[in-house]
Amino acid sequence: MAEPLPRHLLIPFAGRGSPACRAALATLRLPNLETLLLRLTLADTDTQDDSTRSPPHERALARALGLPPADDGCIPWAALEARKTGLAAPGDPEAWGLVTLCNWQVGIDDVALGDPSAIEIDAAESMALLAVAQPFFEEDGIALYPSDTPGRWLARAPIFDGLATASIDRAVGYPISQWSPLGDASRPLRRLQNEMQMLLYTQRVNDERTARGVPPINSFWLSGTGVLKDGDLPSPPLSRTPVVELALRDAALRDDGLAWAAAWQALDAGAVAGLLADLTRGADVALSLCGDRGAQLFTVQPRGLARWAKGLFDRNRATQVLESL
């Protein structure tokens, strides 16, 4: 019988380089995380810069799932979802992408991406807009399908093969121009975005949203592009899926240092404490801490007496680890 896989907790935005969150880091008191880091061993480090389209937590999740290495911005999240839901058959060579409805926030000097998770779209609105959008996408050879998440569609087209796109978690709050795909291959997509902006402006759905006091949906963001080959699919599917804890995300993206620190305290008392309890009971556990620039994976490994003794005096380790992310 195969050995059980470790319980793996993956925490995006565990470290954050934005001013308020970075200042809040010094105030954190995370006793359960401190104890976990004393008892676990650093097994893997992934450090890049914060200009990568694929953020550290997405790269860490792809590794944990057993997906093969991909070029920056080309982790095939959409193709993986299409395969799991049955939209893509085994052996399907087509490329897929995630189309996420969003609010582009128009400023004096630039247009920034608002967080799609804040637009409060329901399934009926998502399906109504999908029906309107499909003919426009089809003109460019892109087939659109609904997903289980309102406001997010699966798109299938050859244009997505090798097209690097930025994760929403990279782009939120920043100028669209900073993270939009460039080059000749993306020109049809930029034109399609312009067409969709004009189309969405006239939709009854947005009139009703305005009456409710929620942000209008005025564009879409493309991400998760790529091809999933048969040999790339984890086997068995989902067997190595870590628990992805998103409690820190919203505060981190807003650079709300107080809320981020409060979320960390609650996380330490909740999911982190639970992982520590599992470890204490003898379970095989793993912890991935991810920030803007890097991710670190901690696992259960045999430790010699010297390393154990050193750990007893390394009481600032949690803050140091989070700061390094």
Where is each model-derived feature located?
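N-terminal basic/disordered segments at the start of proteins
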Residues: 2-24
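Flexible loop/turn segments at secondary-structure boundaries
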Residues: 16-19, 217-218, 226-230, 293-298
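An N-terminal, globular interaction/scaffold subdomain
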Residues: 22-119, 123-126
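Extended, Lys/Arg-enriched charged tracts that mediate electrostatic binding to polyanionic substrates
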Residues: 118-146, 202-219
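Internal, conserved structured core segments that host functional sites
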Residues: 121, 153-160
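Acidic carboxylate-rich catalytic motifs and surrounding loops in phosphoryl-/glycosyl-chemistry enzymes
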Residues: 145-152, 221-222, 287-291
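A contiguous, surface-oriented mixed alpha/beta subdomain in the mid-to-C-terminal portion of proteins
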Residues: 148-150, 159-280
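C-terminal regions of proteins
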Residues: 257-325
